[in-house]
Amino acid sequence: MKYIPEPFKIKMVEPIAMTSREERANILARAHYNMFGLPAESVYIDLLTDSGTGAMSDAQWAAVMRGDEAYSGGRSYMHLMDVAGSIFGYSYIQPVHQGRAAEKVLMPLLVSRPGQLVVANTFFDTTRAHVGLAGGRPVDNVCSEGLDSAKVAPFKGNMDVAGLEKLIAEHGDDIAAIVMTVTNNSVGGQPVSLQNMRETYEVAHKHAIPVCLDAARYAENAYFIHEREEGCQDRSLRDIVAEMFRYGDMFVMSAKKDAIVNMGGLLGVREDGELAEKVKSNVISFEGYLTYGGLAGRDLEALAVGLEEGLDMDWQRYRVGQIQYLGDQLEEAGVPFQSPVGGHAVFIDAGRMLPHLAWKQYPGHALANQLYLDAGIRSCDIGPYLMDRDPVTQEEQQAPFEFTRLAVPRRVYTQSHMDVVAEAVTKIAREPEKVPGYRITWEPPVLRHFTSRLEPIR
């Protein structure tokens, strides 16, 4: 694919420096071979996450200066509510400091008794954790295409609707809620079609099961629908988003992705009734007062601007095109990845790239460590290392994939950076047997990948 020129110009820069391989080896050992333990200043190209790592626009920075820091009822809150309400169409919308805060507030209100199931097209890590912390059992139910990284299909993030109906038939009242993750991060940032969202919603409501949208990448999903779903090519992204949100009863959102802010999130409830009142009580307990939700007024202003900027068609065309450019280079080099690429990242299939490693040796994490050691590039595992142990048996859980995620921050890196990444991955792919596996030497009980300590298996 030909590289799409940036639809913006750069007004501010930050120097980055390359370390030596010897320095990186020492840094990696001091971090206990955990990507989250690396000092950011020792990273040359940081693809750990696209969450909160984007570059804000001049309009967002100007909005920061308008921040009203009133404790209650500030105009920045009112501005955000006007923008969010017009885009998403929900009666009650609550700012929170980030996506997992919305999950912490909402999940205990959905899971009413221990052992209830919450079914998703696929959970991401924090959502899965909060279902478990609320006493529920997270169940992944993605379509079969999403489980084959080599298969090219337009909407590999879709819910398996037939599988959902089977789960409902088997478990009935034991299903507390259904979560629709858009885009579907854990299977490669793959989009979900409007048709699938509609069908899932219809099945859920036939059985009186609430649907929650995990909408961190709402704009990228809308762009894929615009490009790939029949009858959507002449629709605006804003119009597509409005329909997407009609197929949910509530939503949680990390605004640090598509709204391109460094901190912030939203929680929405379609009908301002009993659930909304319970949400308000939890927000006051966990996040602060309702009209700031753990954020400064300046953050609310930047978020209001970013929600609109994320829906710009030229921006989304470039954004997805940049990921496609990286994917095309890796494909030419024979590197296996979840195909087609997602909206925010290339998910390298490390299980296929490093066949000499067993899944319990964490191939996705092993490749991430090697990429840092060789080139100073930080990425992360989306696989069994990311998944916590089974809460009942304490056994390791095998993930559908062993991915290494190259998540590209928004408006930060250029074509040359993508070329460096492609070259580094290609070099490793030529001699995959040199990459060692890893074992965990210490781990916490929940969300272990953030703070675990590991060592290479020599």
For each predicted feature, which ranges?
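Short amphipathic alpha-helical segments
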Residues: 263, 344, 402-406
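Short, conserved charged micro-motifs
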Residues: 274-276, 355-363, 411-420
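PLP-dependent enzyme catalytic core of the Aspartate aminotransferase-like
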Residues: 310, 374, 386-458
